[in-house]
């Protein structure tokens, strides 16, 4: 079984090096209720996407030799599901983060190509959502500590800059670590 550390690093790299989904992360960090709501929503949406795309890959694309359509299928389903769920739920914030579908696309695409079976893909998705929850909580704690402190503007900015540098260093380390774990070839996958 593939180690569960790379999905967590991949989430970190997407957030803090590429900027994908960073506005969603900041919105989720506004309050504990928003953090939990967005994490559960993200877990549910991703579970649907991974299961649906896994079935499409193995029972539609592979038999018809259309595996090259996988990125288009993942992108279309992530965009549609994210847009529909955003129109249905308006809790926690009225501002809809536009990059949520990009974050969904990147994570689902990475997991469907890395995992060897559906169970492993869903476990990796759970680990990614735990990373989402952890980073939201850390951002909320940093924001509260900085805004409630009695320091000057320079001291508050320095603390935020230091925290951001730590996140970026962790994401770059995670991106380098990802190259150590080979992605299995399409023909070496196991069936459901």
From Swiss-Prot:
Descriptive protein name: Uncharacterized protein TP_0148
Native source organism of the sequence: Treponema pallidum (strain Nichols)
Keywords: Cell membrane, Membrane, Transmembrane, Transmembrane helix
Membrane topology: Multi-pass membrane protein
Transmembrane segments: 5-22, 42-61, 66-88, 101-118, 122-139, 159-181
Record flagged with keyword rRNA-binding: no
Top-level lineage group: Bacteria
Location in the cell: Cell membrane
Lineage: Bacteria, Pseudomonadati, Spirochaetota, Spirochaetia, Spirochaetales
This protein's record includes keyword Cell membrane: yes
GO cellular component entries: plasma membrane
